């Protein structure tokens, strides 16, 4: 489909296409017209009249066969008739300029096109339909009311009239700050949905982290070797589970090393661990319990169990003595202590689980422990479901609340929050009203940059150049 938009769009179409009945220029909006481009193709043209079109301008959308030659020839003929090739995002930029959508909704168009799963699609649709815009309208309305009261007071300063009690203004600012905090707090989840939930796969060297990544992806993405320290940098891949994208991050094995390159990789492991929403801690179930406990304490000290999901994976189950005999009992899901265990594999696993539970109990939290074999695929599905269930619970907790998914919006909200905090401090310290009012106006400015009520050519250029041509 080729789109032409602008005041001369219908006239340009008439120069290129011979219609069976009448012309584009004489057609009403929301009309389909059949026509022929001589020697090129038969086409179907959708006619839209301003302001009832995507861009808010007169527009035509020409549906033709998808042959590269046909498309190229049509583009050439349209250009010769007076049209100009569109820049990336130009149609959406015109829609924004003509008031068909605000800037946050325009950005949602790009997110919608880029969405690769149900969760990111839902978030983009919510924003496109005005989710964040509605929240910001409420916020700006609150702040405008506060500013109006303060500036009215300034107009009557010589008469010493107080239009708003300071405690009342502080209460109003607290309400606005709380509103902004809810939005900024949603960014971690919103950004994860948009870009893929970050899942760090961490553990000591040679525990099978890269094999686990490859098994989850169903392809050999990371290099697997029996030599410890093979993975020296992070490897990231998107993995979809039940309509949600997860960004799996394979990391360098944690160990003491004199290799400077490997040391940098290990530092990056710790960085990714801090930023992950979920952490898969991988252990070789065949290692001595004391060694495993030491590795576990090291990882646990870097995980925030209040905000991060931790899944313990006891890998290489297929190498356990007596594994095949105990396999049915291990396939039931996450592990717990079994006081009646007699099988060697069960006893070995039970000992590890007991010691790990003692360590976890000191944190007043619970974690999932899964015995699996990344090599054979045993219990891989249980790991996938543990990730999926946790993410679904987070989304359910958010309910119908608006999620901030865009880093630009998050930064603007954070800056507005800082300005309002200064205004609040000013009211508490009896700072002159005009200075406090200036802080609130600054907050309004930054909120306005999100929807485009305040914008610069540089900001608009940065946003729309990321679009594909045709949108």
Q: What is each of the regions a protein language model found here?
A:
Residues 248, 282, 313:
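Generic enzyme active-site microenvironment
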Residues 36-39, 45-48, 230-257:
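Switch I (G2) and immediately adjacent beta-strands of P-loop GTPase domains
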Residues 6-9, 50-53, 67-69, 101-102, ...:
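Conserved nucleotide-binding/hydrolysis micro-motifs of P-loop NTPases
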Residues 213, 237-238, 244-247, 270, ...:
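Terminal RNA-binding accessory module
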Residues 1-122, 126, 130, 303-306, ...:
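A glycine-rich (often HGG/GG-containing) alpha/beta subdomain
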Residues 121-240, 257, 275, 286-471:
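C-terminal-of-GTPase-core extension/linker across diverse P-loop GTPases
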Residues 264-286:
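Inter-motif core of Ras-like GTPase G domains
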Residues 262-265, 436:
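Short, conserved glycine- and acidic-residue-centered signature motifs
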